[in-house]
């Protein structure tokens, strides 16, 4: 019998801002099946009040694991919201709840970052802000993952780093993920 440590429940891609389904699915996974869930929480366009409401809800249903992300920038985004970077959201969650905060990392580099060195610097900000572990976003080359972990160690990023796994069902899915990550 498969007994995963957790099931990750995505928030949506492409700038989706409604996470009610995410929270309900995570609640069902934990309540009905007894499997820990990790909810994705993206900060794009959210205020501190919005996030506090979400944190209180998650605490109330016993969900302790949050993958804190900036999220995809939606078309027409006006720059609103209190969180410009994932590290800002991580810090806020850390200061306002008792959660296992997970940060995203990018072994092949974040698509918007101009260098892998700056990418590692940004990752260090996430850990310093309160991320207790990291999970990778899409990568294709295992050597990049191993090299990335070594660079993290050298940068004094000493939290667990897990390779994110997503079942691939078609080529279109791979191409879409490659443009988002």
Model-derived features: where do they sit?
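Non-catalytic positions within long, well-ordered alpha-helices that form the structural scaffold/packing
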Residues: 59, 127-128, 153
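Alpha-helix-loop-beta-strand connector modules within alpha/beta enzyme cores
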Residues: 16-40, 83-104, 146-165
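Active-site mouth loops of central-metabolism enzymes
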Residues: 1, 37-49, 102-118
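Hydrophobic faces of well-ordered beta-strands that scaffold small-molecule active sites
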Residues: 5-9, 37-41, 66-68, 101-105, ...
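Glycine-rich, proline-tolerant flexible connector loops at the mouths of alpha/beta enzymes
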Residues: 2-25, 71-81, 132-147, 151
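Glycine-rich anion/phosphate-binding loops
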Residues: 43-57, 80-84
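Catalytic-face loop-and-helix region of soluble metabolic enzyme cores
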Residues: 164-181
């Amino acid at each position: 019998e498969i007994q995963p440590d957790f099931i990750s429940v995505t928030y949506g891609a492409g700038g989706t801002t409604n996470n009610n389904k995410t929270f309900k699915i995570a609640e069902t996974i934990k309540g009905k099946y007894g499997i820990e869930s990790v909810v994705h929480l993206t900060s794009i366009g959210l205020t501190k009040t919005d996030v506090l409401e979400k944190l209180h809800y998650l605490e109330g249903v016993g969900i302790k694991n949050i993958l804190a992300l900036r999220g995809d920038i939606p078309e027409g985004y006006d720059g609103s919201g209190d969180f410009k970077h994932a590290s800002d959201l991580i810090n806020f969650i850390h200061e306002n709840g008792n959660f296992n905060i997970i940060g995203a990392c990018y072994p092949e580099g974040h698509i918007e970052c101009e260098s892998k060195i700056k990418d590692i610097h940004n990752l260090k900000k996430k850990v310093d802000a309160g991320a207790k572990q990291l999970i990778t976003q899409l990568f294709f080359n295992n050597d990049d993952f191993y090299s990335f972990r070594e660079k993290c160690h050298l940068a004094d990023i000493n939290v667990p780093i897990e390779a994110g796994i997503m079942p691939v069902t078609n080529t279109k899915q791979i191409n879409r993920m490659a443009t988002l990550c």
